[in-house]
């Protein structure tokens, strides 16, 4: 499987059986910049703390960097 990996947001090969993930959360600059985003791959979908959004998927490049809605 190929997943996008931060910080470069490049597509990289991950080991067989891994899943891609997109993790998003707010930091002190959330109001100005939007949520922080972490892209990667893991053996299983990571467990996250409250307030952190995680999406996992298992097809090539299924975790692109989310686009921010313009108002």
Swiss-Prot record:
InterPro entries: Snake_3FTx, Snake_toxin-like_sf, Snake_toxin_con_site, Toxin_cobra-type
Domain of life of the source: Eukaryota
Compartment(s) of residence: Secreted
Keyword Secreted belongs to the record: yes
One of the record's GO cellular component terms: extracellular region
GO molecular function list: acetylcholine receptor inhibitor activity; ion channel regulator activity; toxin activity
Keyword Secreted: yes
Tissue expression pattern: Expressed by the venom gland.
Primary location recorded for the protein, binned into one broad class: secreted
SS bond list: 3-20, 14-41, 26-30, 45-56, 57-62
Record keywords: Acetylcholine receptor inhibiting toxin, Disulfide bond, Ion channel impairing toxin, Neurotoxin, Postsynaptic neurotoxin, Secreted, Toxin
Function summary: Binds with high affinity to muscular (alpha-1/CHRNA1) and neuronal (alpha-7/CHRNA7) nicotinic acetylcholine receptor (nAChR) and inhibits acetylcholine from binding to the receptor, thereby impairing neuromuscular and neuronal transmission.
Family: Belongs to the three-finger toxin family. Long-chain subfamily. Type II alpha-neurotoxin sub-subfamily.
Protein name: Long neurotoxin 1
